Amino acid sequence: MIIWIASYPKSGNTWIRSLLSSYLFSSNGEFSFNLLENIKQFSSRDFSSELKNKELDNQNQIFSNWLPSQRLINKDKKIHILKTHNAMCNINGNNFTDEFNTSAVIYIVRDPRNLITSLAHHYELNLDEAFKFLTNERKIIFPLDENTRNENNKLKDLNFISSWSSHYISWKNIKFCPIKGMMCIF
């Protein structure tokens, strides 16, 4: 089953992953960037043999593979800790996750007044642009380390994040693991 470390971008997900990785995966509790590989970022593309080398024409191909990818991850019946920036959403009938794939959620909340400055620096935006980013109900982000599309204009990956408030509410109102969920607020 999956334990999600979920957050809006620039909220401290990597920091929490660093703490957990040092605690769970090192013999002496010391941090190393190599340890972050133990808590990967969820991408349906990375975990789906069907999607791994396939060229994607539209976003719905990614959304429709969220649950099948999670079922593949959970085939080994082990606990998997995964990072996500996706909102807990349903797009075109495709749920991001469900009670059959999720054991618990660690949701990280960062005050949006602090987050906006971090967003502006990270994405090289002015504060007005960062505010629009933060309040965009249909916001999608793409990996920064790669181009959004490959040389054939096919999608590589994406995260549907929505606005900061909708993202927070989507995970706060999760119904199938409310007791096991944990919220980090800073």
Regions flagged by a language model, labelled:
Residues 186:
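G-domain G4 guanine-recognition motif of GTPases
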Residues 1-183:
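PAPS-dependent sulfotransferase catalytic domain
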